Curated annotation (Swiss-Prot):
CDD domains, alphabetized: S1_eIF5A
SS bond partners: none
This protein's encoding gene: eif5a.L
Post-translational modifications reported in the UniProt record: Lys-50 undergoes hypusination, a unique post-translational modification that consists in the addition of a butylamino group from spermidine to lysine side chain, leading to the formation of the unusual amino acid hypusine. eIF-5As are the only known proteins to undergo this modification, which is essential for their function.
Protein name as it appears in the record: Eukaryotic translation initiation factor 5A-1
InterPro entries per the UniProt record, alphabetical: IF5A-like, IF5A-like_N, NA-bd_OB-fold, Rib_uL2_dom2, Trans_elong_IF5A_hypusine_site, Transl_elong_IF5A_C, Translation_prot_SH3-like_sf
Listed PANTHER family: TRANSLATION INITIATION FACTOR 5A FAMILY MEMBER
Quaternary structure, from the entry: Binds to 80S ribosomes. Actively translating ribosomes show mutually exclusive binding of eIF5a (eif5a or eif5a2) and eef2/eEF2. Interacts with dapl1 (dapl1.L and dapl1.S); interaction takes place at the polypeptide exit tunnel of hibernating ribosomes and prevents translation.
Family as reported in the entry's similarity comment: Belongs to the eIF-5A family.
GO biological process: positive regulation of translational elongation; positive regulation of translational termination; translational elongation
Length: 154
């Protein structure tokens, strides 16, 4: 009976976001806009009006898809900020459009797809050329994606 239970992908139940006051957010920081983790690329504050608070206008780029999102909120309100984890993995192979990655601790993971666009093409080209590369993987709000690559130091 207990053989069909899989505990390998559990987490400690920690939240994928934490609250931060709007006025404390900064450009190049991260925030959740329309339910997506975004990097803040533009921010402006309007003055306190006759009725109500100063407003903060934010423009963010989704860290996974590159889409642009905008939001306006009172400066005293809290916004969610995603917990972002960044890890470097050594690329050891590519199997059926999935990256085979080796972590610092020696664990191998093969569950990440080759990213779309130029980054994916660059990873494929460098792998086929036999270069040793490190792939940077971003993890936020239970989503993961390869976002960068760099040559390994010898």
């Amino acid at each position: 009976m207990a053989d069909d239970i899989d505990f390998t992908s559990g987490d400690a139940g920690a939240s994928s976001t934490f609250p931060m006051q709007c006025s404390a957010l900064r450009k190049n920081g991260f925030v959740v806009l329309k339910g997506r983790p975004c990097k803040i690329v533009e921010m402006s504050t309007s003055k306190t009006g006759k009725h109500g608070h100063a407003k903060v206008h934010m423009v963010g780029i989704d860290i996974f898809s590159g889409k642009k999102y905008e939001d306006i909120c009172p400066s005293t309100h809290n916004m969610d900020v995603p917990n972002i984890k960044r890890c470097d993995y050594q690329l050891i192979g590519i199997i059926d459009n999935y990256l085979s990655l080796l972590s610092d601790s020696g664990d191998v993971r093969e569950d990440l797809k080759i990213p779309d666009g130029d980054l994916g093409k660059e990873i494929l080209a460098k792998h086929e050329a036999g270069e040793e590369i490190l792939v940077t993987v971003l993890n936020a709000m239970s989503e993961e994606c390869a976002v960068a690559l760099k040559a390994m130091t010898k």
